[in-house]
A protein has these predicted regions:
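Short alpha-helical transmembrane segments in multi-pass integral membrane proteins
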Residues: 1-20, 80-147, 193-249, 304-368, ...
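N-terminal transmembrane alpha-helices
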Residues: 7-39, 43-47, 60-75, 79, ...
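Small-residue hotspots at the loop-to-helix junctions and early N-terminal turns
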Residues: 49-60, 135, 139, 273-288, ...
Length: 455
């Protein structure tokens, strides 16, 4: 079945599984980058505790770079799928080309931050000179060679928009395998490679990302033949860029808010470096679980957007129904794994003094996965139906408006010795439950105003 016919005619429940599985695997493998680095770094012979703390502090900026690439890609994905659904091949070529132009701009910004801003950023979160040195070294490498992750994110969405998510997964697998192979070689110094510690972890990560980006570039040029390619389509078009970011900006802000949340949580937990490290390690496990929801969201968005472009009320309704059902099933599985095996994850990271805090965080925060996953699915539905504002509001509630004041207030009781650190972790389930209720109200409004009115 041709890709465009598949998006139009295949039953939505089957289409979502066919598109969703590769995307879920791709997102899970993306989370593996961070977990693998931390696992190998946690088992360094010298300085592993400081190194884990350093990786916790650099993580928000890594997330921010991914946010810029993925957010631009999300806007491109939905707009490209809708444009192809309308049969406008010329505009589709401009959408794809302008997304690559935006990728160049994003890389230049990351490069400049890597050269001039890294030290000030790390020093704002720690006074430990060893942690500062490791954090600066790691983050500078990731920023200067960030073109790999940025363009991988863009090519991934371009392939997903045309129903070729399997190929984006192949690229992700190749990059992950490269990273896993290089990590022990470059961190510990195996064979002719010198021991580089956290620098080795950074180099292994960016080399894997570049490998993925190059492979997806080849797939994009060879397989995405529904629209034209070439430098002429990269010429900036203000109208196209505006449309991309009308959809994608909320996704960028949502991802950026995750970075801000982790950064502020690091500041809140600064009084207890072990709890700070534990939170950073848990967040990587949490990302692994929630990236399952993100991967399914990336199937939900183009399926519903394509149906919206062709004004198919039935396929939109099916996309919403099955998207939520499959998301709930994945999140229940994630909760079961993290609640049953917290000790195994702690052992993987060799978390030392942070072990007790890590297990405590996992026991409490994993309860929120069900509601967090539903919120992610809601946002994918909103984005497909031009609900950028609603998506942004949910992100603000989840990552800023509720979570940070609540965690800050709870931390006062912890610092005064009235309660344990676990009180801070309860801010997460409370936030997700409130946001989920608001998200349901938004979904009812969008269905009434944009779906029920279709013929």
């Amino acid at each position: 079945m041709a890709e465009s016919n598949k998006m139009k005619d295949m039953p939505v429940n089957k289409l979502m599984i066919q598109m969703g599985i590769p995307m879920i695997l791709s997102m899970a493998l993306q989370a593996v980058y961070n977990i693998v680095d931390s696992a190998f770094v946690g088992n360094m012979r010298v300085g592993s505790e400081a190194a884990l703390n350093a990786l916790t502090l650099v993580f928000p900026v890594q997330m921010l770079m991914v946010a810029a690439g993925i957010g631009t890609g999300v806007g491109t994905n939905a707009l490209l799928a809708r444009t192809l659904g309308q049969g406008n091949r010329e505009k589709a070529a401009k959408v794809a080309g302008n997304s690559l132009f935006l990728g160049v701009i994003i890389y230049v910004v990351c490069l400049l931050f890597g050269i001039f801003g890294v030290k000030a950023y790390i020093s704002s979160q720690t006074v430990d000179s060893e942690v500062l040195e490791m954090g600066v070294s790691y983050l500078r490498i990731c920023c200067v060679i960030s073109f790999g992750i940025i363009f991988f994110s863009l090519f991934e969405k371009l392939l997903q928009a045309t129903g070729r998510s399997l190929y984006s997964t192949i690229g992700q697998v190749v990059g992950t395998v490269v990273n896993i192979i290089l990590d022990p070689i470059m961190i510990y110094g195996i064979g002719p490679c010198p021991e580089m510690g956290v620098k080795g972890a950074a180099y292994a990560t960016v080399i894997g990302q570049v490998a993925s980006a190059v492979l997806l570039l080849i797939f994009h040029m060879k397989l995405n033949r529904e629209f034209g390619h070439g430098p002429k389509y990269m010429k900036p078009n203000a109208g196209v860029i505006k449309e991309i970011y009308a959809i994608g900006l909320p996704a960028i802000i949502a991802q950026a808010l995750m970075s801000i949340m982790v950064y502020v949580m690091n500041l809140i937990l600064k009084f207890n470096p072990s709890a700070q490290t534990a939170y950073g390690l848990f967040y990587k496990v949490q990302q692994f679980v929630l990236f399952l929801a993100f991967g399914l969201r990336d199937a939900i968005t183009p399926i519903i957007a394509f149906a919206y472009g062709m004004r198919s009320k039935k396929r939109i309704q099916d996309g919403i129904k099955y998207g939520l059902i499959y998301t709930i099933a994945l999140m229940i599985l994630g909760i079961a794994i993290t609640e049953i095996f917290p000790g195994a994850f702690a052992t993987l990271f060799n978390s030392g003094q942070s072990r007790e805090y890590f297990i405590g965080a996992m026991r409490v925060i994993s309860v929120s996965f069900l509601f967090a996953g539903i919120n992610v699915a809601y946002q994918g539905i909103y984005q497909a139906l031009d609900g950028g504002l609603e998506s942004l509001v949910i992100s603000l509630l989840r990552q800023l408006i509720i979570i940070l004041p609540l965690a800050g207030i709870f931390s006062l009781f912890v610092r005064n010795g009235q309660m344990g650190v676990s009180l801070i972790w309860w801010a997460f389930p409370i936030t997700e439950i409130i946001s989920c209720f608001v998200g349901y109200v938004f979904l009812k409004k969008i269905r009434k105003n944009r779906v029920d009115v279709l013929n």
